[in-house]
Amino acid sequence: MSQESVPGGQRSAQTSTDEPKSPEHWNIGGAINGFQHVTSAKSALEQLGVGGISFTVYDQHFGMKWAGGRPHSFAAGQTKETFARLVQEYNRRGITFNLVFSNLFIEEKHLGDKRCNWMLERCYREGNGVIVGSHVLARYIRDRFPDYRLIHSLTHFHKDPQYYYDHADLYDVFVLPPHLNYRAKVLQEMIERLGAERLELLVNETCFRECSIRQDHYDLISKACLEDDWDLWEDLTSGFCQRAHADRFTRLEEPKDVKRIKNFTLSQDEVRDLKTLGICNFKLANRQVPAQQYAKWMDYYIIDRLGLSTTMYVYDNYYRPAAHFAGRAS
């Protein structure tokens, strides 16, 4: 299977970039808090005649034993039933949904978890997927829910292409560690071996390139979820990175020196270069960010990169309310 995509075509809206008009698919995190942003962007692009762009979202309800990474977005009053209805609402709007079950340490003894199985059953629809960190869980889902797309989580941080070739029969899509974003020859080889539609690249990883605790951090979060140690989980997800890296920032003499600390966030030009290479699937993380930052990242990587910022402003502020103002004027 491959990532859902919308066939490309000529855009009726003019763009200011020479970027190839090839299809691109965006897997956008923070689905619980980002509903308005993603659905509005999809609707606007469609009405403006901008073809070739499709969306999937990902997130997970809190308190899931199979969870890993940092997808747990607690929303006041949310239950697993309301989360499942959110998935259904995205699907109704033509946006597929990836559940996040990326725990790295799932074993056979954990597969009977009622809460996680309930979520798999309730969200089981064509086009939806599961982001997985355990091969044991991946085989379990493949056997019992064969229509789910299986997305291999980047939390393993495997940089050797052979690892992905060895597991090509189990997963539909591989989310690659951000280190590989800069290795064009490796990406080209993987495109030739696996196909571009099976590779997904994260564009806005804010983790520092030289971070020495990255893997340990993800391992501990997986263990906290598996052991229902929610006090540890809160400690690992609330200001953990800020505390771990505080010393390097206190050593900076001026705010402008922040630019010297490199992370893995890509520029618009780097995204264009990856598209030229053949990459068509991109991941936009939105973990633990306010709605304002969520919108900024979507604007930067999608709307502004396509040269549509002014068009979208006019669309939102003039075209959409036109009937209302015309009615008041009459």
Placement of each model-derived feature along the sequence:
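Active-site pocket-lining/capping segments in soluble small-molecule metabolic enzymes
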Residues: G8-Q162, L170-S330
